[in-house]
Amino acid sequence: MIKLVLIRHGQSLWNLENRFTGWTDVDLSENGLSEAREAGAILKKNGYTFDVAYTSVLKRAIRTLWIVLHEMDLAWVPVHKCWKLNERHYGALQGLNKDETAKKYGEEQVHIWRRSIDVRPPALTEDDPRYEMNDLRYKALKKGEFPLTECLVDTEKRVLDYWHSEIAPKLKNGNKVIISSHGNTIRSLVKYLDNLSSDGVVSLNIPTSIPLVYELDENLRPIRHYYLSMDGEVPEGEIPKHITF
């Protein structure tokens, strides 16, 4: 049996401020740092180890992974970073407060942008100061590869491309893998692994910094999945609450 651990980054500063974040590189809040330490302690107490780790090129996911591995005394584990594991790009919504955006455009429209799988928010323009193409971390991307906005289908496409080319082969070779990423990135992976319908993924929420374990067969088909707490597996349908750590 193969085990895969997925973890959404701890609470970020813009999660705290209720802003659309996307590819904006904001850091963890103090609460997010605590959540990451707690996740590492949970994994260590439950006897988990890893051979390789994957994350995005955004510091909230990277820092979460660093803290988790540090808490587990696994700082030596190789870490691979790739933009294809970035959060969904929210286009011109990035940086905007979600409540204020709902007042401006209407709650229904904002809900469609956030939760439909194939509707993109308004795009950034290339002269927008929020346009990240010139950031050094993206220097290998061609102009046509760089998103100005994304729907969940767009996010899923790049995430699964990286899954099939890099992560799945490691799992099939017996490596113990952890992925520290973002809400919509993990939603994309869960949709694929569990073969969820479009309606099923719309209502799917991924909590910050709670380890989600997938037990997979030799063909990487899921046997079962569950969240972890200090007390072990959490009953199906339940999500453990964070403790101060």
UniProtKB/Swiss-Prot annotation:
Record-annotated site: Transition state stabilizer: 182
UniProt record similarity statement: Belongs to the phosphoglycerate mutase family. BPG-dependent PGAM subfamily.
HAMAP family: PGAM_GpmA
SMART domains in alphabetical order: PGAM
Recorded metabolic or biological pathway in which this protein acts: Carbohydrate degradation; glycolysis; pyruvate from D-glyceraldehyde 3-phosphate: step 3/5
Gene3D superfamilies documented for this protein: Phosphoglycerate mutase-like
Function of the molecule: Catalyzes the interconversion of 2-phosphoglycerate and 3-phosphoglycerate.
Record: active site: 9, 87
Reactions catalysed according to its record: (2R)-2-phosphoglycerate = (2R)-3-phosphoglycerate
GO BP, sorted A to Z: gluconeogenesis; glycolytic process
Listed Pfam families: His_Phos_1
Keywords: Gluconeogenesis, Glycolysis, Isomerase
Molecular function terms, GO-annotated: phosphoglycerate mutase activity
List of residues binding substrate: 8-15, 21-22, 60, 87-90, 98, 114-115, 183-184
E.C. no: 5.4.2.11
Alphabetical list of InterPro entries matching this protein: His_Pase_superF_clade-1, His_PPase_superfam, PG/BPGM_mutase_AS, Phosphogly_mut1
Organism: Bacillus anthracis
PROSITE patterns in the record: PG_MUTASE
Protein name, UniProt field: 2,3-bisphosphoglycerate-dependent phosphoglycerate mutase
